[in-house]
């Protein structure tokens, strides 16, 4: 059997239909909460004891959502979110003042009486993501314009006060604090409205059910204009605090709407037009140095000669004619100073020119030197070693001239190396270094036999002939190579300093050598480089024998100079110089291709 209390609850559910809405600029849509009606009807049919447990569990869930919202800014998946929703019904009967006074919240009491709340039905307010079970609420009209009271079925009111500024909802003697409401998501907070002072706009239709028949009907709900609230909203329960806050906000809005004049800073320009009249009246403070300079300028201007009265410019430069004379005097002063500077610079340039002329004359006088002084200087230079003289910085062609003088002197009167000038010996060492270093690194092979290398360096004559191809090369001892040339070393070894044949030498054990094509070309280039000096000295000796046959007898230095001039006229030095350059190129570059091209010519 269903009790009378359950029947009363069912009638109240039909009497106060559930509609929820959120004002414009929110994410919640007006809908009927049919699921909440079904859950409430099922919970009422079970009995008072089960209804108590469900109510207590819903209240506990309600508090846990508040505590979890305060502990973390981001809601987790397990927590429910509190969504404040307004339920409106214009047909709600106005209760008596005695009942309303009994249902008010006592601020001093901190305990909550749950025994009086057992018989209340439950509804569920659904958000887009989560649901929260709260007691059944119904909205009642109120006399005040800025306050709306919300009453429940029995003695458990929930009040939504001062929608414009602060929101406080009470359930029984328990109240929702400021921290819990502030920590709700910004999209779920209800912004307040100033329902009295603002102009009302047209409302929109909300579907609801008739209180008696249960037939759906349409109602026009007026929506007031929204006011933008400040970010820092204070929530309180007292009426006095709300009035003071609203009054202070109105005053602040009025003052904020007043247009303030823009502050204009005075410009700090040097022109008279931009400066303010107060700045013009202020005295100009100058230092003592500036005052002295101004006084000197004024005195110089006064001492100047008067300007011709007949002189007039076609176009007046200044509006004030009195300033014209002053500036003309200044211009003449500047011209005088410039003329003085020009005279000083011209005098300095003249002195510099005279000094340079004197220096040139002294250099010309020093250039003329006596013969005695030259002999002393030559003797001093000869005492210097060649490495510290100018010969060490000369080019290859200068070393070649000294080297040719040395060969001519050795051909006429061979002397020991100790009696030869260091300059000639230094030039010969530089030429030999460039030739032999390239030959040892690029031409002579490391796999050649030592006896074959010794014959190339000591024996001046080498003859060759072609043979049939046979296996094996005598120079490199590679049996797979085909030998196509046979080489004969003939002649007597000679002294490297005076180019004379030696009396005692080791006999040649092997005269004929069978060589391959690559070894033959390398040996031919190396032999021509090592014995290039000997060939030049032999040519000069032939020239001396020709002169002796013609009975041209000269003595000492005159013979060396005359032979040198004759060789120079016969272009012998030029041909030997070209040959030396070609040998250096063959030794340093790819010798095979260059040698073949040279041999074909």
UniProtKB/Swiss-Prot annotation:
Biased composition range(s): Basic residues: 24-35
Bias (Polar residues) ranges: 54-81
Subcellular location: Nucleus
Sequence segments annotated as region (Disordered): 24-106, 171-219, 260-283
Residue numbers of Phosphoserine PTMs: 236, 238
Chief place where the protein resides: nucleus
Biased composition (Basic and acidic residues): 92-106
InterPro entries, per database record: DUF4211
Keywords: Nucleus, Phosphoprotein
Domain of life according to the entry: Eukaryota
Pfam families xref list: DUF4211 (PF13926)
GO cellular component, one term: nucleus
Protein name: Uncharacterized protein C17H9.06c
